[in-house]
Amino acid sequence: MPSIVSSLLLVVLLTSPLGAIPVLYPSPPPLPAYPSPGVRILRPPESLVAPLGDEVVLECETSLPPERFEWSYRRWTPNGTAVNGSPGAGFKYLKTSSMKANVTQEAAISRLKVLVRQDTLGEYRCNGWFGPLLVTSTTARLELATTSVKSQEPVTSLQWQITNGNSVLWPCGQPVRSNPAASWTFYRNGVELGPEYSGTGGNLFLRNVSVDSSGSYSCQATNPASGERIKSTSSMELQVVPSRGSQVKAPYLLPGQPGSQTVTAIEGGTLLLLCPGVGSPPPTAVWSSPDIVGAVNNKRTRVLAHALEISNVQIGDSGTYICYLDNGVRPPLEHFIQVKVEQPPQIVRPPWIDMVNEGERVQLECEATGVPTPEIYWLLNGKSSIYDTEAEQLPNGHLVLHSVLKRHAGYVQCFARNSLGEHSAGMSLQVTPKPIHSESTQQSDHNHSKANRGRRPAQMIPPSAPNVTRLSDESVMLRWMVPRNDGLAILFFKVQYRTVGEGKRKNWQTTNENIPYGRPEWNSEMGKSFTASVTDLKPQRTYRFRIMAVYTNNDNKESNMSAKFFLQPGAALDPMPVPEMLEIDEYSETAVVLHWRLDSDADEQLITGYYAYYRPSSSAGEYFKATIEGASSRSFTIGNLEAGTVYEFKLQSFSAESASEFSALKQGRTQRPMVSTTEEATLQTGVRDTTTPSHNETFSMSPIVTGTIGGGAVLILFVVTTCLCMWRRRNSRAHRGGGQNKPRMAELREDFVPLDSCSPTKQRQRSRHIHITLNPLAQQQQQALDEKNDAEHDMTYFQRQPTYDYDPGLRRMSSSSLRRSQRTLERAGSSNGNNNNLNQSADMGPVDNPGKPGRVLMKRPRLSSRSENLSSGSLNSVGV
């Protein structure tokens, strides 16, 4: 069955229309994970071999539709290098729609049609422009299909006679050269043989020959690209005779058969090792290898008659193989076969760097494997590094930029190249420009300049050029920094942007948002960093951004422009790893610490950093933003928060071209304000405070120090209070002593009561203390009554303790107690049941008035401040 399938394939190949044949290099192993900025070559052009006059198509596909495609070309040289020796130099851009080449673009695919001529043979590259980034593919070779016979090879005709049962190996195709590798057809007596007789490289292999195998053998090579056929100059006459038991012969080689061999294989392919030789009786082959352990007895090898087949060839299969042909007759025949396994180049350590500052020295590393050893070269935004005066390639392939300049910003690629092809890896290099220190253009008036003559004028230090990251199809995130400086303070920032590459130059557009500078503190060694988002953009367009800083002198200064940024649609972007928020630690009253992780299968090298968003959980306003540089970060401290406040946080990872989805929201809180240890516990009535302090409360002082300070404060408070009390008592005594020198009857009567009011029957009445609100309109009558009572001084009095008002009693007095007090006052004053006397006088005493009983003199204490203005009129208190 395999022989039938092989025959059908050969027939289809030979009868199909002839054209360009791709060079069948083995597929390289899967690419290792390396930092991809989101734009790359998905399918580079393939090398082709075609005859003159044919039209071939080179096809290139990128991960995203670029702004435009360009193709570059270099003439083919025998060793595949340019004149100056660099494999990455000497390429020139092709003019589109020319007679030699025609370029078409369809979304993310570009096709180059080339007419095969002597001046179009060479190497081609596909270049895709993504804003300021130029991504270059690996090279594709366009070679001419050729078939020829080695001119120095003589015509050979072999005569072989062997016994039946042997196996014969005839190297017919050695004199023929073909590009691409020729397909072989073998003939016996002019009749074509089946493909089951074919070996590798034009070798005819006849197994277990018989008398019927005798005949004249020849071969013919066919170029699969051009269809050209050429007959080999070698022929062989084979005569097979029956074996005789009496004739024995040790294994030997026939004339023209190779002895020692060197075989080259490509990693991943299939290798067939042949062991020629005949004998009588027919010998048996035994395989071994002094260099490779288990070279024969494994799942990838199969022992055939006079051959060893190795599938899925690996680099470890390189070495020496020995074939012993033994038929029992000494000596056995030994074959030494040297196997070399070639490997396409593969970059195992790609270049990677996050961000560099202008003027810094940077070394980019690139390591690759391959056999033969690959040669390393570098492209800086599509241009060979040998043309850059600041670039130097070290012998180990690493690239050194002695002083990074703004022109180095873009796409940096490392290429590894050997005879089997090329492999590349790239990264987006971001350069932070140096801050431009410019003096303020505003000038003071003449007098002010005289007063400040000799002083250095204040400077306006502009922010750095912003770095741009895609957030969505319509928004981006900007990151910039203000370097440490002693210049004018910044009040706020404005973001400006404009589209580029659309014909007429567009004006700058300014966003409405004022981005506050915040606290005048530097949050890093470099200065202070800021972030802001810009929305309402349009995808598939290229933008430039800049930051406008407004200073305290009401002047402004803009930053340098950002690099061109092409806003790509998110549907074509690979998703970024989404961080998972683990926990939020309470760091202090104004700071928390975020902890997160990535999934185990997440590619960390795709990440440039993280964005942290936060806001108070009670707020529905905009999120505050913080930038976390570095893909390996797993925690971050966020400060300048409110004490004892619950915040909600979310994260997203970002790269130069895109950002991930948001992580799940998670809440955390800052520590509560510190509580002093001198604060006394608050006790509720009948309840003892047993509250345990929260773990958020922080005591900044030790208990001994705090207790000492608290005790001292209490002692000082006690001494001050005692002094104030003594001072007030002394003033009170002095006031009373001074008042004795100026006695007044009204004041004396306020402090005395008549003797008849001290009778036992009156004791109960005197014990009451009643507060009555008087009519303010009766104050004039009260004054007249007081003057009358002052004249009646012939009664006997005794002194008693004064009764003072208690202001809260006004709140507790009910209407019922007021009525009882009025009735008591009527009985005491013998007012004939008329309590209207209350509205006439509040201070009473016995008076010598004929026809009237003795009057009761009552004390009217002075009003306290709290009893004033409780109603629309003046309020007085009367004590009975």
Curated annotation (Swiss-Prot):
Classification via PROSITE patterns: FN3, IG_LIKE
Regions of this protein lying in the Extracellular compartment: 21-703
Cytoplasmic topological domain: 725-880
Classification via InterPro entries: FN3_dom, FN3_sf, Ig-like_dom, Ig-like_dom_sf, Ig-like_fold, Ig_sub, Ig_sub2
Glycosylation sites: N79, N102, N208, N447, N467, N560, N696
PANTHER family in UniProt: BROTHER OF IHOG, ISOFORM G-RELATED, PROTEIN SIDEKICK
Entry comment, domain topic: The first fibronectin type-III domain mediates a specific interaction with Hh protein, in vitro. The second fibronectin type-III domain is additionally required for in vivo signaling activity.
Subunit details: Homodimer. Heterotetramer; 2 iHog chains bind 2 hh chains when facilitated by heparin, heparin is required to promote high-affinity interactions between hh and iHog.
Protein name: Interference hedgehog
Species of provenance: Drosophila ananassae (Fruit fly)
